[in-house]
Amino acid sequence: MKRLTSILMLVAICYLCPMSTESQNQPAAPTLAPSPSLAKGSRCFELRTYYAAPGKLEELHARFRNHTMKLFKKHGLEVVGFWGPTEKEKGSENTLVYVLAFPSREAREKAWRDFRADPDWQAAAKESEKNGKLVDKIDSVVMMATDYSPIK
């Protein structure tokens, strides 16, 4: 229960952080100067929010369930959890939120690069989008735990 509370706090806090839209072909964002309050040796976390195309959220869930999860494991993208909003806000009915963990920022960049280059991912993405794209927008926040965070 304590771990779940920590994860939910992480997700809630991250919603207060400014988010940037990710582009599949964009270089990694520049890093901020390290804060003294960041935990030394913390893993790198990534909060991702997907805004599904209208009417495509269940197809997006199916792609994660049937293809993406296996490929995440293959390429070292450790899933902390997936969430769906329970309060009605503009666009929330098409939203999927998840958190990934990596040993380091460099490991994150390599894992995503390898994942996107994987022919199995490319085939799954192409097949799942044969009737139109599934995702309108992706927001991504790359984070490190603070020194007082129960999850590192």
What is each residue range found by the language model?
Residues 19-23:
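Signal peptide cleavage region of secreted peptide precursors
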Residues 52-61:
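Short, surface-exposed ligand-recognition loops at beta-strand->loop->(often short) alpha-helix junctions
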Residues 1-4:
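Positively charged n-region of N-terminal signal peptides that target proteins for export
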Residues 144-151:
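Short, low-complexity, Pro/Ser/Thr/Gly-rich segments in the mature regions of secreted, periplasmic
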Residues 24-41, 62-80, 88, 92, ...:
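An amphipathic, aromatic/His-enriched active-site/gating alpha helix that lines ligand/cofactor pockets
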Residues 7-18:
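Bacterial N-terminal signal peptides
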Residues 45-49, 97:
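Active-site-flanking beta-strand signature of metal-NTP-handling nucleotidyl enzymes
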